[in-house]
Amino acid sequence: MTIAFTSGEPSGIGPDIAIIHAQKERQENLLVYCDPDVLINRAKQLNLPITLKENETRKASEVSVFPVKTVVEVETGVLNPKNANYVLEIIRKATHDCLKGQCSGILTGPINKAVINQSGIKFSGHTEYLAELTNTPKTVMLLATGQLRVALATTHLALNDVSNNI
C-alpha cells in the first residue's frame, strides 16, 4: 500500500514527520510530496540519516519522494507566503495521484491557512480544498479513534457563522 504524504508548510513540522517516520522499517510505502532539498536540509538539522528514492521503499532511513520544488528558500520555523502555491501544489499532485489509483490515501501534513491567505489565495482548509479538487459537493470532517467516530456539523467557520450553516 502506498500512502501519499503531503509535507505541508515547508518551514513547519511536516518534513520532520516524514524524516522521523522514515527511520523505521514499515509495511506501507509513504510517498512524500516535498522539495527534496527541504528534506535533506531538515534531516541534517535533526541529525538523522536519509536517502531519497523516487520509487517505493520500505527500508529504514529511506524516503520515497515525489519532488516538488519550493518557490523560495525555506528557513525552518519562518513562514513565507511566497511558498503558498507550493503548499497547494503538493496537495493537488497527491490528490491527482490518488484519483489515478497510484496511492491508496492521503496523509496531510500541517499547513498554515493564514499564510496561504496572506499570499492572496482564498483558502479555508484541507477539507474544502480536497472537496474542490475532487468535485465533491458535500463533505464531512470525521474524527475517529477506537470505537468513537465524530462527524463535525461545520468546518473552518467563525463561531458567529456556525448557526447559519447548520
Segment roles from a protein language model:
Residues 1-126, 165:
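Contiguous, glycine/small-aliphatic-enriched amphipathic segments in soluble metabolic enzymes
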Residues 34-37, 70, 146-148, 157-159:
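Glycine-rich beta-alpha junction loops
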Residues 98, 120, 134-137, 157, ...:
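Short, well-ordered alpha-helical segments in soluble proteins
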Residues 30, 139-140, 148-151:
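Small-molecule pocket liners
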Residues 66-68, 142, 153:
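Hydrophobic residues at beta-strand termini and immediately following loops
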